[in-house]
Regions:
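Active-site pre-lysine segment of PLP-dependent enzymes
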Residues: 2-21, 25-58
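Conserved PLP-binding catalytic core of the aspartate aminotransferase-like
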Residues: 114-115, 128-162
Length: 192
C-alpha cells in the first residue's frame, strides 16, 4: 500500500508534467487505516486527480457493480457526463448502496474479521520456508512460491481439486517468479 504522503508526491509530480492520475481505491475498505492510505483528502486540492471507489467487493455483491468517482476537475466531470449511460445506476443498485453504507454493524464486524484473519494468515505463512508472503493491506494475500520446480499452476491445480480457489498470478506483469494470491475468508475457510 502507498501512504497518503507518497500519493501526494506522485500527484504533485504528475500535475507538473500535466498528467492526470486515477487512483483505484476499490479495496480501501479492507485496509487497517483508511485515512493513512486514501487519496480522497487530496481531491479538493488537485484537479489532475480522480479517485475511484466501489462497494461491491466489501459488501460481497459483485454482480451489483456499484461504484463512484471523485474529482475536483469540473471539465473532466463534464466529459464523463457527456459519455455516461443515462441509466448507469438502476433503482435496485441505488437502494442497495444506501443500505450497504448505512450498515455500520456489518462494516465494523467485517473490518475486524479481515484484520484478525489477515494477521493470522500472514503470521502462519511466515513459518513456511517454501513460501514468501507479502504483508497484506487488503482482503487478499500475495505469496511467492520458493520451492524450485513447483509452479503457481501446480499449486492452483492441486488446490482447485480440494475445492479451494486461489489466483494463479503467472499472467501478472512485473511478478518475476511463481506467485499465487488468495482472498481472506472466514476463519474456518482460511484454516482449510
Amino acid at each position: 500500500a502507498i501512504s497518503v504522503s507518497d500519493l501526494k508526491t506522485i500527484v504533485q509530480t504528475c500535475q507538473k508534467l500535466d498528467i492526470f492520475v486515477m487512483i483505484d481505491e476499490t479495496y480501501i475498505e479492507f485496509a487497517s487505516s483508511i485515512p493513512a492510505l486514501s487519496a480522497v483528502c487530496l481531491v479538493p486540492d488537485y484537479d489532475n486527480l480522480m479517485v475511484l471507489r466501489g462497494v461491491s467487493k466489501f459488501f460481497a455483491a459483485p454482480g451489483l457493480r456499484l461504484g463512484y468517482g471523485m474529482t475536483s476537475n469540473e471539465d473532466f466531470r463534464n466529459i464523463l457526463k457527456e459519455y455516461q449511460n443515462p441509466w448507469s445506476l438502476n433503482s435496485i443498485g441505488a437502494f442497495a448502496g444506501e443500505l450497504f453504507l448505512q450498515d455500520t454493524d456489518y462494516i465494523q464486524k467485517t473490518r475486524q474479521l479481515i484484520e484478525t484473519e489477515r494477521t493470522r494468515i500472514y503470521e502462519t505463512l511466515q513459518t513456511i520456508p517454501e513460501l514468501k508472503a507479502f504483508k497484506p493491506s487488503a482482503n487478499f494475500v500475495l505469496v511467492q512460491i520458493l520451492n524450485e520446480g513447483v509452479t503457481s499452476f501446480d499449486v492452483f491445480d492441486n488446490l482447485i481439486r480440494q475445492k479451494l480457489m486461489i489466483r494463479d498470478c503467472s499472467s501478472f506483469e512485473q511478478l518475476d517468479g511463481e506467485f499465487i494470491r488468495f482472498c481472506i475468508m472466514s476463519p474456518e475457510e482460511n484454516t482449510r
